[in-house]
């Protein structure tokens, strides 16, 4: 069994999605996992990969890769991050309605990079975006895409700031108490 097949079988066996796996320099094997929507996990509910998820997959992968005699010196297992790549058709279906960055293989209207909201369109996909003048729709297939990633959304509006300190009581003469 190849190292890719061993990694995929192990990750999916635990109920996670294998987003990407790659070999780096100096024997690095990097694996990105994600939780499958609707699946129940030991670490509790939540849509994001936890440290415990990564630890569990790492321990099993170390064992499997040793048994399969796969050559590597370092193993990294992590979540794909907020800017998760979209690789498969299932990824596009899962994240339809989300804001994405897309890079095309060939330029369209003089550009390769676009940002907008992903939508399904039969067998193909659409990106709804505004070019600064008007709303536009870019139709594309997965074969035309070089790279696609979710646009990270970081919301600080729910965070409460520190309450302003009350001014010190003033005594006549301008001195603080």
Swiss-Prot record:
It is found in: Cytoplasm. CDD domains: YlxS_C. One of its GO terms (cellular component) is cytosol. InterPro entries: Ribosome_maturation_RimP, RimP_C, RimP_C_sf, RimP_N, RimP_N_sf. Pfam families: DUF150_C, RimP_N. Its main location: cytoplasm. GO terms for biological process: ribosomal small subunit assembly; translation. Keywords: Cytoplasm, Ribosome biogenesis. Belongs to the RimP family. Required for maturation of 30S ribosomal subunits. This is Ribosome maturation factor RimP.
């Amino acid at each position: 069994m190849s190292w890719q097949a061993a990694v995929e079988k192990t990750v999916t066996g635990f109920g996670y999605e294998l987003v990407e796996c790659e070999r780096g320099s100096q024997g690095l094997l990097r694996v990105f996992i994600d939780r499958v929507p609707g699946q129940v996990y030991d670490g509790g509910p939540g849509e994001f990969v936890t440290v415990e998820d990564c630890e569990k997959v790492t321990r099993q992968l170390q064992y499997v890769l040793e048994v399969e005699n796969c050559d590597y010196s370092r193993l990294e297992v992590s979540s794909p991050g907020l800017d998760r790549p979209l690789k498969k058709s299932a990824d596009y279906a899962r994240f339809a309605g989300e804001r994405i960055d897309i890079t095309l293989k060939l330029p369209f209207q003089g550009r390769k990079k676009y940002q907008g909201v992903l939508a399904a369109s039969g067998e193909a996909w659409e990106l709804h975006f505004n070019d600064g003048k008007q709303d536009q729709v870019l139709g594309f297939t997965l074969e035309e895409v070089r790279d696609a990633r979710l646009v990270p959304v970081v919301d600080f509006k729910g965070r409460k700031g520190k309450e302003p300190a009350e001014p010190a009581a003033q005594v006549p003469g301008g001195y603080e108490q």
